[in-house]
Curated annotation (Swiss-Prot):
Homodimer. One of its GO terms (biological process) is prolyl-tRNA aminoacylation. It comes from Shewanella baltica (strain OS155 / ATCC BAA-1091). This is Proline--tRNA ligase. It comes from the Bacteria. The lineage of its organism: Bacteria, Pseudomonadati, Pseudomonadota, Gammaproteobacteria, Alteromonadales. InterPro entries: aa-tRNA-synt_IIb, aa-tRNA-synth_II, aa-tRNA-synth_II/BPL/LPL, Anticodon-bd, Anticodon-bd_dom_sf, Pro-tRNA-ligase_IIa, Pro-tRNA-synth_IIa_bac-type, Pro-tRNA-Synthase_IIa_type1. Its EC number is 6.1.1.15. GO terms for molecular function: aminoacyl-tRNA deacylase activity; ATP binding; proline-tRNA ligase activity. Gene3D superfamilies: Anticodon-binding domain, Bira Bifunctional Protein, Domain 2, YbaK/aminoacyl-tRNA synthetase-associated domain. Catalyzes the attachment of proline to tRNA(Pro) in a two-step reaction: proline is first activated by ATP to form Pro-AMP and then transferred to the acceptor end of tRNA(Pro). As ProRS can inadvertently accommodate and process non-cognate amino acids such as alanine and cysteine, to avoid such errors it has two additional distinct editing activities against alanine. One activity is designated as 'pretransfer' editing and involves the tRNA(Pro)-independent hydrolysis of activated Ala-AMP.
Length: 571
């Protein structure tokens, strides 16, 4: 490709409304342009990267035995009503009516459509197992689209769905997809980590997320220092204390605490050890019989709402109770709540169950109890894992301790079981002629999100540093004063021809531009290898070669450059 015949729309200035580096650089490098909130057009450079990501995803899906199909982005609402998600999904589901007043949605995902397709096309166990995938545009009406392609409303996704009669083949396909996702991210040259995850609104029995590691990642990953164990912070299991509860050494006493509305203020004012305090959080209960539930964690710990959501007593999704309701039921407001004398169900974290001589609110405004001990001062409550893990704690596999990293979720695989097939009556006849509900798996990759995540992991102060496999161009040719020197023109054109014939994506900057502008553009758009051609180089019989990632410059003899570039590009 010649720059003179290409839409290279680079910008010097960082757009004011771009918050994260990938959004900034995708705009500056001329990869995307905003059309409306969360909606973007891909310019040629951006589309080249997107298509390379898409190609790797497609190749690995095909290798894993998945079969490509294509389903409509517009879906009939009737299917969503069947599964109950018409009501459950929320405002992210964009709903509309056609001219005949029929309800439709813009698909954020395709479980309903694929299940409907399979129940019509597959009738016998002989047609199973089956794994179908598509690469299709999705739409989620995010309340606040942000971070460019990291959280846009419209995005490109690969979603696969597998169908089975038995758990064994479902497990085999799940493992194949796990390996395929690992291969995809490895081929793209990205540092990543698969982690155990909560199944969320999609549901199911097993789930893994695939995270590209980056400091800007929205997700916190807890991983073992001694093994491959890793989990999303929402899923990471807190250790159950092995030490017995300490004996009581303090008397229970009621203390005036007028200026201690938070744990931090209580600890500072009374010189307490924060691990000797608890936080009492009141959430909405799951039934009229239990309208409120108290969840108690240690003062230095944070409530894990995903874990709390799984408690039978707690309404789903977890909702903090309004202060007015708390005051009406308990007689005190947040900041003065505790377990003694509570007339609502209590669930305490494992770490709280072994505490002794601890402090908590007295359920009277501006008062706390100090020296609380279980069994002596109040009965032991229901115990559960309801908190986030913290760095340094032992991991559940016993092989190390927790460490933390930030990640950007780019892939998610689920074992759905019969969540959708049962509600939609997707059945087949087994070998005995009996009707069986299909087991399902679901496997998603954010194709457009990978592009942004790759940038978040690969950039410097000059621009993007693309991994080799997904760079828009592998080689950039920079001829100095090309329009004044026939020698430079001839050699640049020959190299351009040779690289094209070798199947290498090359960009020849044939503009009448200052060298500084040409260099800046090549670095901004992240081309891995650049070759500078000038009269001085020609006199010396060498090309000046620069590696974008390392910054290393070398003078390469004419007869060696092509082999060097072939080896560098092909890896």
């Amino acid at each position: 490709m010649r720059v003179s015949k290409y839409l290279l729309s680079t910008q010097k200035e960082t757009p004011a409304n771009a918050e994260v580096i990938s959004h900034q650089l995708m705009l500056r490098a001329g990869m995307i342009r905003r059309n409306a909130s969360g909606l973007y057009s891909y310019l040629p450079t951006g589309l080249r990267v997107l298509r390379k990501v898409e190609a790797i995803v497609r190749e690995e899906m095909n290798k894993a035995g998945a079969i490509e199909i294509l389903m409509p982005m517009v879906q009939p609402a009737d299917l969503w009503v069947e599964t109950g998600r018409w009501e459950k999904f929320g405002p992210e589901l964009l709903r509309f009516k056609d001219r005949h007043n029929r309800d439709f949605v813009l698909g954020p995902t395709h479980e309903e459509v694929i299940t409907d397709l399979i129940r019509k096309e597959v009738s016998s166990y002989k047609q199973l197992p089956l794994n179908l995938y598509q690469i299709q545009t999705k739409f989620r009406d995010e309340v606040r689209p942000r971070f460019g392609m990291m959280r846009s409303r419209e995005f490109l996704m690969k979603d696969a769905y597998s169908f089975h009669l038995d758990v064994d083949t479902m497990n085999e396909t799940y493992e194949a997809m796990y390996n395929a996702y690992s291969n995809i991210l490895t081929r793209m040259g990205l540092a990543f980590r698969p982690v155990l995850a909560d199944t969320g609104s999609i549901g199911g029995s097993m789930s893994h997320e695939f995270h590209v590691l980056a400091q800007s990642g929205e997700d916190l990953i807890a991983y073992s220092t001694g093994s491959d164990y890793a989990a999303n912070i929402e899923k990471a299991e807190s250790p159950v204390p092995t030490e017995p509860r300490g004996a009581a050494t303090e008397e229970l006493r009621l203390v005036d605490t007028p200026n201690a509305k938070t744990i931090a203020e209580l600890v500072e004012q009374f010189d307490l050890d924060i691990t000797k305090t608890v936080k009492t959080l009141i959430v909405v209960g799951a039934s009229e019989a239990t309208p409120l539930v108290a969840l108690i964690v240690r003062g230095d710990h944070e409530l894990n709402e995903v874990k709390a959501d799984k408690l039978d007593l707690v309404a789903s999704p977890v909702e903090m109770a309004p202060e007015a309701l708390i005051r009406d039921a308990i007689g005190a407001g947040p900041g003065s709540l505790g377990p003694i004398g509570l007339n609502i169900p209590i669930v305490i974290d494992h770490s709280v169950s072994v505490m002794s001589d601890f402090a908590a609110g007295a359920n009277v405004d501006d008062k706390h109890y100090f020296g609380i001990n279980w069994e002596r001062d109040l009965p032991t409550a229901q115990v559960a894992d309801i908190r986030n893990v913290v760095e340094g704690e032992p991991t559940p596999d016993g092989s190390g301790t927790y460490a933390m990293a930030r990640g950007i979720e780019v892939g998610h695989i689920f074992q759905l079981g019969t969540n959708y097939s049962k509600s939609m009556n997707a059945t087949v006849l087994d070998e005995n002629g009996k009707s069986q509900v299909l087991l399902m798996g679901c496997y998603g990759v954010g194709v457009s999100r990978i592009v942004a995540a790759a940038i978040e992991q690969n950039f410097d102060d000059r621009g993007i540093i693309w991994p080799e496999a997904i760079a828009p161009f592998s080689v950039g040719i920079l001829p100095m004063n090309m329009h004044k020197s026939h020698r430079v023109t001839d050699i640049a054109e020959q190299l351009y021809k040779d690289l094209n014939e070798a199947g290498i994506d090359v960009l020849l900057d044939d503009r009448k531009e200052r060298p500084g502008v040409m260099f800046a553009d090549m670095e901004l758009i992240g081309i891995p290898h650049t070759v500078v051609i000038g009269d001085r180089n020609i006199d010396a019989g060498v090309f000046e070669y620069k590696n974008r990632r390392t910054g290393e410059k070398q003078d390469i003899p004419f007869d060696q450059l092509l082999d060097l570039l072939k080896n560098a590009v092909k890896g």
